[in-house]
Amino acid sequence: MTFALGQRWISDTESDLGLGTVVAMDARTVTVMFAASEENRVYARTDAPVTRVAFNVGDVIECQEGWSLSVEEVIEDKGLLTYLGTREDTQETEVTLREIFLSNQIRFNKPQDKLYAGQIDRMDNFVLRYRALSNQYQQHKSPMRGLCGMRAGLIPHQLYIAHEVGRRHAPRVLLADEVGLGKTIEAGMIIHQQVLSGRAERILIVVPETLQHQWLVEMMRRFNLHFSIFDEERCIESFAESDNPFDTQQYVLCSLDFLRKSRKRYEQALEGEWDLLVVDEAHHLEWSQDKPSREYQVVEGLAENTSGVLLLTATPEQLGRESHFARLRLLDPDRFYDYEAFVEEEDQYAPVADAVTALFSGVKLENSAKNQITELLSEQDVEPLFRVIEGDSSEEEQALARQELIDNLMDRHGTGRVLFRNTRAAIKGFPKRNVNLLPMDIPTQYTTSMRVSGMIGGKMAPEARAMKMLYPEEIFQEFEGEDSSWWQFDSRVNWLIEKIQDKRSEKILVIASRASTALQLEQALREREGVRATVFHEGMSILERDKAAAYFAQEEGGAQVLICSEIGSEGRNFQFANQLVMFDLPFNPDLLEQRIGRLDRIGQLRDIDIHVPYLKGTSQAILARWFDEGLNAFAETCPTGRTVYDKYSDVLIEMLASGNTEQLDEVIEESAKLNQSLKSDLEKGRDRLLEMHSNGGDKAHEIAEKIASTDGDTNLVTFALSLFDTIGLNQDDKGENALVVTPSEHMMVPSYPGLPYEGATITFDRETALSREDMNFISWEHPMIQGGIDLLLSEGVGASAVSLLKNKALPVGTILLELVYLVDAQAPKRSGISQFLPKTPIRLMMDGRGNDLSAQVEFDSFNRQLSPVNRHLASKLVNSVQGEIHKLIEAGETHVLPKVEEVRQQAQKDMQTNLNGELERLQALKAVNPNIRDEELEVIEAQINELTGYISKAQVQLDSLRLIVVSHN
């Protein structure tokens, strides 16, 4: 390296220092001053990590005074360069600029500048960058975007609803699936799609207080969406940042009670400018024409101010038509304006459902059914289809004609677009429940303490006393103190220990009402028999619960028993277990259903054993009999349970409080009758049409298969591991399909997006991720991959590289130049541009004569023939052919333009086909189905105009390049 005072050099290792000037030299060292960053560096002369900055004819360079010069000649004198050329601002010719006056801020952002300045990256980084661009492009174009990356089983009806609703602009729908069919997951998938496509940036979820935790966990665990729970305390804290606390976070979760109680907070939430509002347990919003409840008004206000609304409810409309209408009214007040009109319209659907049932079953259509169909659809539409169905066409044609009729009827179906409801009856794949009710003798210690408690109990409200009598172990502790070892003599504990020993190879889930009972049971199992058990209760943090759940899920060396309290178990699913023990019973049927729902979910592969040990002659015995004989709530799901409970709760509470069972048989008999009649009403009113529409039929299975085929993508695994390597993360293989990824000291950036400070355990396998909640499920949509790709591209990793091609068929020294361009339409994310024209890479492979060989030379197979070059040699190679590289880049510019035009035209065509198709369908439907909102049509028209503008203005720029030189050795 020859240095001279006044020369300009750039640091290879600290490119952000700017342009440096040689200010001092001695025999062994050289001092370079970087004026832009006010830093000096002293290097050894022999191998200083710096590169000489020399510009060529054709470059545009900037002077310290701010003007630019287009270089026409370069003169070297005693190691210093002087540039001659034309000033860009005044057009003055033959202006000279000595290199000492070059701007200190010059950064080499363009890939060719980096190449000339010797900032040459490793070859594998260039490959990684190209793969990042290609994969990012494919992900954006995929119609399944937003559905592949969530940690959930691929269940067809859920995927269908999410796919159907998630792609709409500002969806307003009611998700009314029965318990255990996964409404929360459906809502999460819709939110996830809306977030990824940029349609929803601000989201508010309103849920009952007891479910806040569950939603927080589900959104974070399954979809990597980090919500913040807002309560009064949080709002006061946020006041420092903003007048409206709701503006401090994009994703907010709060309880309905919190908004109902505080008018101020409710008004602030109204001003929050949300894109999407999600309300869980919407059946609690009571409404009547003259007197809507305060809760209902709160949600109504929010729904009026928010463009997208998802309401979730488990209560079927047959159990309350008025409240069902009220929920639909929240979604579209213009359409559902009058309850009487709604009832009348609903009654007209009964014949539609009959007609569809007839079509589905494939029986010959009666004339009456045909007339009904003709009344609903116009005659010229249906006549040819009837002819096909009744003629002697092939079975396939008949099936298609039936399907077309069904689709047309579906589209006309009043609430088809706003309401989705799946029932267990319509969806296969649920386990059978084996129920074991186990009456046990009551220990004398309990009888004594309960008797004494009854005598000194004084005036307690019946409800409080009923609650108390359900838990004899707590009454005993009141007299004997907290430390009393009730579990030494409780017959249920003795039975439980035997059961655990009997089922050594099975995982057992035990649920008790109170956290204290759960903790004491764990102690009992540990101290009496050394059983490996773990506890789960509301006093634990999310992380502690995760660890407990993971310990329970572990195949080898994990806990055999997990003991949960009532609240602690909310929202957690343990499908891998099939033994459920109810140590005591909850007060109402909803909670009972929730307990069984921890195991009895879609995706459970085995039948479930439900064990209910209870003490004879106690309140528990009364409750066990009523649940079993009155509701049959242990053996099957009980959507009617709540209604029956509301009717008989007073009598039940009285019985539980006093222990008097005279009326029990009568109450059980009446409950069973009422339950039966409600269930048959439900069955009669089952809206087959709605069910068919909600479960998506074959289409749903296609979506599930499509996503399943992308699981286990080896391309993703290879890419992720190279990405983590390049950015500098440590990776340790942990077995069981898992890796541990931790930050290292040599990272490219101080913190890696999506990775906690202490690292994370990751898996690429969906099944593993489902059984182990402590692992991150890595997919193309995971923040660690998305964030990593963004980091790669923004930090300029792999923008320029040099490789050798050992090929005796070509003369030594032949050069090839690989150019990767990026077509980018500068448009806001919410415009939906990424679906039609995401950032699109175009690869060219220029030979020495300026021809493009990319069509003949495929990237991967060519890349395997190349070998890397060290930086020093790479710089020399670049300097020796710099002039030729210039010419090839110019040739590349002309080759790429027609390709950019093709990309634009294809994007425009895709967009027109997609959006015009949707627009025409909605316009045709609007004529017959009042459920289509005008606003939806206007939005699509505006979107077409807006996108046409963005696509036509899409720009292209050179993103990265690689010089390839042929050698023979």
Curated annotation (Swiss-Prot):
Helicase C-terminal domain sequence ranges: 492-679
GO BP, sorted A to Z: regulation of DNA-templated transcription
Motif DEAH box in this chain: 280-283
MF-aspect GO terms: ATP binding; DNA binding; helicase activity; hydrolase activity, acting on acid anhydrides
Residues given in the record as ATP binding sites: 177-184
InterPro entries assigned: Helicase_ATP-bd, Helicase_C-like, Helicase_RapA, P-loop_NTPase, RapA_C, SNF2-like_sf, SNF2/RAD54-like_C, SNF2_N
Alphabetical list of PROSITE patterns matching this protein: HELICASE_ATP_BIND_1 (PS51192), HELICASE_CTER (PS51194)
The UniProt record lists the keyword Aminoacyl-tRNA synthetase: no
Record keywords, A-Z: Activator, ATP-binding, DNA-binding, Helicase, Hydrolase, Nucleotide-binding, Transcription, Transcription regulation
SMART domains associated with the record: DEXDc (SM00487), HELICc (SM00490)
Pfam families cross-referenced by the UniProt entry: Helicase_C, RapA_C, SNF2-rel_dom, Tudor_1_RapA, Tudor_RapA
EC number: 3.6.4.-
The Helicase ATP-binding domain, residue ranges: 164-334
Assembly and oligomerization: Interacts with the RNAP. Has a higher affinity for the core RNAP than for the holoenzyme. Its ATPase activity is stimulated by binding to RNAP.
Similarity section: Belongs to the SNF2/RAD54 helicase family. RapA subfamily.
Protein role: Transcription regulator that activates transcription by stimulating RNA polymerase (RNAP) recycling in case of stress conditions such as supercoiled DNA or high salt concentrations. Probably acts by releasing the RNAP, when it is trapped or immobilized on tightly supercoiled DNA. Does not activate transcription on linear DNA. Probably not involved in DNA repair.
Classification via NCBIfam families: PRK04914.1
The name this protein goes by in its record: RNA polymerase-associated protein RapA
